From Swiss-Prot:
The keyword Ribonucleoprotein does not apply. It comes from the Archaea. The active site is at R18, N36. This is Acylphosphatase. One of its GO terms (molecular function) is acylphosphatase activity. Keywords: Hydrolase. Belongs to the acylphosphatase family. PANTHER family: ACYLPHOSPHATASE (PTHR47268:SF4). NCBIfam families: PRK14435.1 (NF011009). The keyword rRNA processing does not apply. It comes from Archaeoglobus fulgidus (strain ATCC 49558 / DSM 4304 / JCM 9628 / NBRC 100126 / VC-16). Residues 3-89 form the Acylphosphatase-like domain. It catalyses: an acyl phosphate + H2O = a carboxylate + phosphate + H(+). InterPro entries: Acylphosphatase, Acylphosphatase-like_dom, Acylphosphatase-like_dom_sf, Acylphosphatase_CS.
Length: 89
């Protein structure tokens, strides 16, 4: 298991990006959360197996139909215990 902090920039707020991310994460069994940041980016904290997180990152880089992803920054993080994947506010 590994944990990642993911920062997504572009047109990613107000276009269903967080709910898209939650759906994909739950389908893949990834734990953590997603939230909007005040600077217009989306922050994702994700815990899972490395291969599963690779699939997740591919989906995040594409985003939902109305989103335009311009950048994705990924950092390794400390593993925290989450029961599920949620949208944080």
């Amino acid at each position: 298991m590994i944990a990642l902090e993911i920062y997504v920039s572009g047109n990613v707020q107000g276009v269903g990006f967080r709910y898209f991310t939650r759906r994909v994460a739950r389908e893949l069994g990834i734990k953590g959360y997603v939230k909007n940041l005040p600077d217009g980016r989306v922050y994702i904290y994700a815990v899972g197996e490395e291969l599963t997180l690779d699939k997740f990152l591919s989906a995040v880089k594409s985003g939902p139909p109305l989103a335009t992803v311009r950048g994705v920054e990924v950092k390794k993080a400390e593993i925290e215990n989450y029961e599920s994947f949620e949208v944080a506010y």
